[in-house]
Curated annotation (Swiss-Prot):
GO terms for molecular function: diaminopimelate decarboxylase activity; pyridoxal phosphate binding. The modification N6-(pyridoxal phosphate)lysine is found at K49. It comes from Bacteroides thetaiotaomicron (strain ATCC 29148 / DSM 2079 / JCM 5827 / CCUG 10774 / NCTC 10582 / VPI-5482 / E50). It catalyses: meso-2,6-diaminopimelate + H(+) = L-lysine + CO2. PROSITE patterns: ODR_DC_2_1, ODR_DC_2_2. Its EC number is 4.1.1.20. Homodimer. This is Diaminopimelate decarboxylase.
Length: 386
């Protein structure tokens, strides 16, 4: 089954472009809010890194979510979209001074700190502004996630976070500082996780750390477990909204949250992944020695995930109902890795057909580049194309 698209409207637009189905997005946000409402101590922050399209951000902000940012630019994008500063968390292993100052000036909720040197800089910059910065420590729990190696973030070998062995020392340093307030612990073990067992392993590790801190009579107000929930790239129509019920219930059942604590989540891909498609036009159909190539006007500069992660995106010829044939679907970029998929079954392709690369709402438009001096793809919502 193919997706439903306003093809007549698409014909009037310059390809390639991103298309966001706002019904899918709003249904996803509604499903999240429905589940979170069961747990009054839960808060969700949208991971802006997944998609910072202003129209998409506005719809997410209207749902009541906070924002999870990893750069000063993302903080600005969130504020422009109307996210309250007191719902913004700022993570990232390499925060520049101007970015920290920006967060302080806006009065964001929390800095997720990844090292003692960073903590010292935040304390110094906060003192210069005569402010106290809320900080949580990103702990690397050494928990492996069943996902692509490039998007694991919770292993000891990864660059992210403070090791469990160093946690006590970092907390001791923070408690001596005058311009930071230690309010919580932060974790994030990876992305595109579909095995709830990975989240259970994280819960077990958080429980261990909580017990360790309580033995020192240190009470933590906030626990932030990051995000990581994946989507079904193979069947975007069958499961357009992820299983948020199981996701939040896993934490409710496994993480021993104290009565005074709040639990924070940072969801990105699961929020926007299924609402977006990259729409591209077929430039040529080329007969090779052993295969056919469908050459698109979209390439790895527009959607880098297949080249970077060997990621799969379901592809559909949305302008043909001819019999199915197999094609290697490639782009125009001068790189051998500019391949969206090999031996892909598509309704017979001809020049001018429109190909939809599905499940491209996350880490698609936001990761586009100008390599080969190409223009960045535009993004349109279904609200605009009625």
């Amino acid at each position: 089954m193919k997706g439903i698209f306003p093809i007549d409207k698409f014909r009037t637009l310059q390809t390639p472009f991103y298309y966001y189905d706002t019904k899918v997005l709003r249904d996803t946000l509604s499903a999240i809010n429905q589940e979170v409402a069961k747990y009054p101590s839960y808060s969700v922050h949208y991971a802006v890194k997944a998609n910072a399209n202003p129209k998409v951000l506005t719809i997410i902000r209207e749902s009541g979510m906070g924002a999870d940012c990893v750069s000063g630019g993302e903080i600005r994008a969130a504020v422009r979209a109307g996210f309250p500063a007191n719902k913004i968390v700022f993570a990232g292993v390499g925060k520049a001074d101007w970015e920290i100052n920006l967060g302080l000036e806006y009065g964001i909720f929390c800095f997720n700190v990844e090292s003692i040197p960073e903590l010292e800089v935040i304390n110094e910059l906060a003192a210069a502004q005569n402010k106290i910065a809320n900080v949580a420590f990103r702990i690397n729990p050494d928990v492996g996630a069943h996902t692509h190696a490039n998007i694991t973030t919770g292993l000891a070998e990864n660059k992210f976070g403070i090791s469990m062995q160093d946690m006590d020392r970092v907390i001791d340093v923070a408690l001596e500082m005058k311009n930071v307030k230690f309010i919580g612990l932060h974790f994030h073990i990876g992305s595109q996780i579909l095995d709830m067992g990975d989240f259970i392993a994280l819960c077990n590790r958080v429980n261990e750390l909580q017990d360790k801190l309580e033995a020192r009579r240190i009470l933590v107000e906030h626990i932030n477990v990051g995000g990581g929930l994946g989507i079904d790239y193979g069947h975007p129509n069958r499961q357009s909204v992820p299983d948020f019920k199981s996701y939040f219930a896993t934490y409710a059942g496994q993480l021993k949250l104290r009565p005074y604590q709040t639990l924070h989540f940072e969801l990105g891909r699961a929020v926007v992944g299924q609402c977006g498609s990259l729409i591209s036009k077929v430039l040529y159909v080329k007969q090779g020695t052993k295969k056919k190539f469908a050459i698109l006007d979209a390439g790895m500069t527009d959607l880098i995930r297949p080249a970077l992660y060997q990621a799969y995106h379901k592809m559909e010829n949305i302008t043909s109902e001819e019999p199915v044939e197999a094609y290697d679907v490639v782009g125009p970029i001068c790189e051998s890795s500019d391949v969206f998929g090999k031996a892909i079954d598509l309704n017979k392709v001809k020049r001018g057909d429109l190909i939809a690369l599905r499940s491209a709402g996350a880490y698609g438009e936001i990761m586009a580049s100008g390599y080969n001096c190409r223009e960045l793809p535009k993004g349109y919502t279904s609200d605009e194309l009625v």
